[in-house]
């Protein structure tokens, strides 16, 4: 296979998935990790994709602005619905929850809406939904608006550390035995500031993300209290996480 052919296939993968890891490229093209990284570097230099740590993103990729009208278009939607329902059942009346951005986060917000629970979020589509539905207690974290993800980010992360919650629900592009990975560094760093002030960290990722490593390490596995994922998740990775004290629920 020529370099041009590899590049074409890699771009087709990105057009379909939006994001690929080096491991996925190696598996799909039957090449070495070094060759995969060279291909990604060349395509990044030519402006055809965006290189991220351990992978690449489609250059035209825009994070969807999730609403009740388009959530059904989310990848692995049915599995994410089950994950959100299971997560909502963890929270008791009167408790507070921190919910971050993404389709699973929006689904969880829908499940929590109307219940006697305080919801803390920096995800504006979810905040707008909760306000429209007249949810009793919504706290919107302050900061600078980030258009690409429809969230607010505190430049120094100082404000985020003031928002303590009983639960923090978050998701990502990858979860391995080492921990949870996020591809957006600014978002990850802002959320990291809150890890020390929340009661429990619960990771919500569909089964396709288990065993994938992409971006920066957001939290070590031993910092994660619970993982809720799909039934098709990589069993080896789940066993490794359980050995480190992570409680796992497959739905």
UniProtKB/Swiss-Prot annotation:
GO terms for biological process: negative regulation of DNA-templated transcription. Pfam families: DeoRC (PF00455), HTH_DeoR (PF08220). SUPFAM superfamilies: NagB/RpiA/CoA transferase-like, Winged helix' DNA-binding domain. Coiled coil: none annotated. The keyword Membrane does not apply. Keywords: Cytoplasm, DNA-binding, Repressor, Transcription, Transcription regulation. InterPro entries: Carb_Metab_HTH_regulators, DeoR-like_C, DeoR_HTH, NagB/RpiA_transferase-like, Tscrpt_reg_HTH_DeoR_CS, Tscrpt_reg_HTH_UlaR, WH-like_DNA-bd_sf, WH_DNA-bd_sf. Residues 3-58 form the HTH deoR-type domain. This is HTH-type transcriptional regulator UlaR. It comes from Shigella dysenteriae serotype 1 (strain Sd197). The gene is ulaR.
